[in-house]
Design a protein with these regions (language model features):
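Short acidic, glycine/serine/threonine-rich helix-capping segments at coil-helix boundaries
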Residues: 192-206
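Short, well-structured beta-strand-loop connectors
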Residues: 52-63, 95-110, 206
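Zn2+-dependent peptidoglycan hydrolase active-site motif and core
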Residues: 40, 55-94, 120-121, 208
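Short glycine/threonine/proline-enriched tight-turn/helix- or strand-capping micro-motif at secondary-structure
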Residues: 6-14, 25-55
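Conserved positions in beta-strands of structured domains
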Residues: 29, 46, 60-62, 91, ...
Length: 213
């Protein structure tokens, strides 16, 4: 299986049959960047709790429910151009999983579910093969325009996300792999997969550093 991301990848996200819509047009509160030691994998766009949030492209809803990992009410749409888009912190969900949607379809209303320390905003991500890249590489919210129908991304466009997405835990007394799986909303099998030196029978010692994401 080919590794992703490659050195570079050309994505054609629009063609003559595709339509597109910027999900919300307002000011950007926070961009795609390292923030407080963690990489922020999308844009935080200001809105109100009554602002309609729209699908960026035609596609199929893969996820539409409350997410306990910090996204709150989250909609994920898998698009026919190969990309996925994430719409987080919604106050209301207006679509269901496996529903086909057109670009511009209202998928929910703005909110701040999943976060306690900030006002209403849309956290918006664009991903290719589950690797996020800067949404402002394909459109400008400030100018309300798309920046073309293709984008050439290099490995560096994904690199900081890959590195910063890794999370480690140092074992304390009494902690087990099952405990880590529950705490970090994952599974034991996934933890073992990203820690090749561990197996289900490994002895977990105090002070051991284990990757959990």
């Amino acid at each position: 299986k080919d590794k992703f991301p490659p050195d570079s990848v050309l994505i054609t996200y629009l063609d003559d049959q595709d339509k597109y819509v910027i999900p919300v047009i307002d000011r950007i509160n926070s961009g795609f960047k390292l923030r407080n030691g963690t990489f922020h994998k999308g844009l935080d766009i200001h809105l109100t709790r009554t602002t309609p949030v729209k699908a960026a492209f035609n596609g199929k809803v893969r996820y539409a429910r409350f997410n306990t990992g910090g996204y709150g009410n989250l909609v994920i749409i898998r698009h026919f151009n190969g990309l996925e888009t994430y719409y987080a912190h919604l106050s209301r969900l207006d679509v269901k999983e496996n529903q086909l949607v057109k670009a511009g379809k209202v998928i929910g209303l703005g909110g701040n579910t999943g976060v306690k320390w900030s006002g209403p905003h849309l956290h918006f991500e664009v991903r290719d093969h589950d690797f996020a890249f800067d949404p402002e590489k394909i459109f400008s919210i400030k100018d309300s325009v798309w920046l073309g129908d293709k984008i050439l991304l290099k490995k560096a466009d994904f690199h900081s996300v890959i590195a910063a997405s890794r999370k480690y835990h140092r074992i304390k007394s009494g902690e087990t792999l099952s405990y880590l799986a529950v705490r970090y909303n994952t599974t034991v099998s996934k933890i073992l997969k990203i820690n090749p030196k561990l197996n289900i029978n490994s002895i977990i010692g105090i002070g051991m550093k284990i990757r959990v994401r």
